[in-house]
């Protein structure tokens, strides 16, 4: 549900007006990132990492692209995904999650795993993933591109590594709100690539 507030934001060399979309914090100013911005954040993250990781766990959907880039940069071959569903209603902060996808314990036990997501906003999903890794006997650390400290539900916890601190709603270049419309494109209707 879109908020009623319109926020004016400077985007690159152009000005843009965006309706707010975060139901938990409807008055956040939005910041739209470019791929160059993401590269800079990852370049800032990588030197922070302490030691090597046995694997990397990307939280869907936000962690897929930064996790893929980081796994390539660090040459991590053991790449896993976790998908966690929380009800999206504002009053559901205490709801229990549903794990839509999670690696089996045999891939986690006695390993050091880097958890990757795009942003630590309220922290629920990341903390529940880290808790499940700990229950499997896995040591883990958390890396995010952005850390929104003020909105975190966890006063005594946060990511081990982050590219930047923000108080804005971040729009990443892979999010559908900044991609060209694809509603007219249908799978299987395009030409096949030449061989």
Question: Model-predicted segments: where are they?
Answer:
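PRPP-associated nucleotide enzymes
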Residues: 1-195
